[in-house]
């Protein structure tokens, strides 16, 4: 099968945009596969996501202290805060978590011929006959995905998948949620038009064998979560002439040597049948 006919598209729609991934393999060589992806999911960081980045209250205060020279008494990543909500009052940006797909690549593929179905035709008459027949069999194309640990990320994006393999007559589409594992399938008939003709002498028989290539492809998609915005901090007794400060979260992460990103991997496996053909052979296996 010429894999240039395999196309994978992935779409996830959110308030802030969506994920789009297009796969197009230029021939049988994996190194020629081209995968394009765009999109993002942006949201104010959730409390449970703080642990994923190692910015719970204690480590965050320690890191802010390394920026300013003194550990603050209070620290916030989003509103509301105490004392009139500093984010609103000073128009400071809350800390947001941005998730984007950063890599998608084919990590494995396999193609192997197999017998899908067979049928024996016998001439039970006392004269020579011509046998005309067609053979077909229903097979199942599949798509399944698995996720690595989502590391406590709170992503509510819906994802719409579309998989097409032209030579395999495969077209599977469905909508899911980010982080949800699914297995989808479709039944297709192979060999529908695979007719044959054979002349049989009295008592002779032939076997019609329908074969196809069973293919599979594995694609890894890596999503990366990063942070933006500022930490609002308070010193009860003031520090360097002020009580309130806003430090960029990236600066704080660097100062505290905190985690700068969280990666999540999705593995997609596609299974399909292609290149069906019929072989007619006698009882000795001769074609």
Curated annotation (Swiss-Prot):
It is found in: Secreted; Target cell membrane. The keyword Chloroplast does not apply. Contains 2 disulfide bonds. GO terms for cellular component: extracellular region; membrane; other organism cell membrane. Residues 1-17 form the signal peptide. Keywords: Amidation, Disulfide bond, Membrane, Secreted, Signal, Target cell membrane, Target membrane, Toxin. Expressed by the venom apparatus. GO terms for molecular function: toxin activity. This is U-megalopygitoxin(8)-Mo12.
